[in-house]
């Protein structure tokens, strides 16, 4: 998915506005994904998946950090997430659809906490960005 200059500006603007909340939003998005799509829990049998779990928050922080890294390197998302793509494809073997589910949950969390930021145009740009991230993370699945 090709991001236009306007998309890139919109995505960078979202991450600038959510700033220090990205980690909390990542944890909330992950918790929302587990609640809305219970089969995604199968990849985390060793986690305490209860609401507010420190393990879910910690993994949410990793998710948010990866999204921030991708946004900061929006012209080279594949390069920025190459190691993460290798990890998920070769070691963890996460079902690729889960990246799209998590992206959707992240959009929902941003909409809940920052409704004024998520105009229709920004929503579309952020959705395209999250789809691009999902595509990069699944590119090495073969």
UniProtKB/Swiss-Prot annotation:
Q: Does the keyword Transport apply?
A: yes
What UniProt keywords apply to this chain's record, in alphabetical order?
Heme, Iron, Metal-binding, Oxygen transport, Transport
Would the keyword Iron be found if you checked this record's keyword annotation? yes
Record's GO cellular component terms:
blood microparticle; haptoglobin-hemoglobin complex; hemoglobin complex
From its record, what is one biological process in GO terms? hydrogen peroxide catabolic process
Residues binding heme b are 88
Q: In which tissues is it expressed?
A: Red blood cells.
From the record, give the transmembrane residue ranges. Answer: none
| Residue ranges constituting the Globin domain according to the UniProt record | 2-142
**Can you tell which superkingdom this protein's organism belongs to?**
Eukaryota
Q: Which residues form the signal peptide?
A: none
Q: Name one GO molecular function term.
A: peroxidase activity
Q: Where does O2 bind?
A: 59
Cite the record's note on assembly: Heterotetramer of two alpha chains and two beta chains.
Concerning its family, UniProt says:
Belongs to the globin family.
The protein's role, per its UniProt record: Involved in oxygen transport from the lung to the various peripheral tissues.
Q: What is this protein called?
A: Hemoglobin subunit alpha-A
Source organism: Apus apus (Common swift)
User: Source gene?
Assistant: HBAA
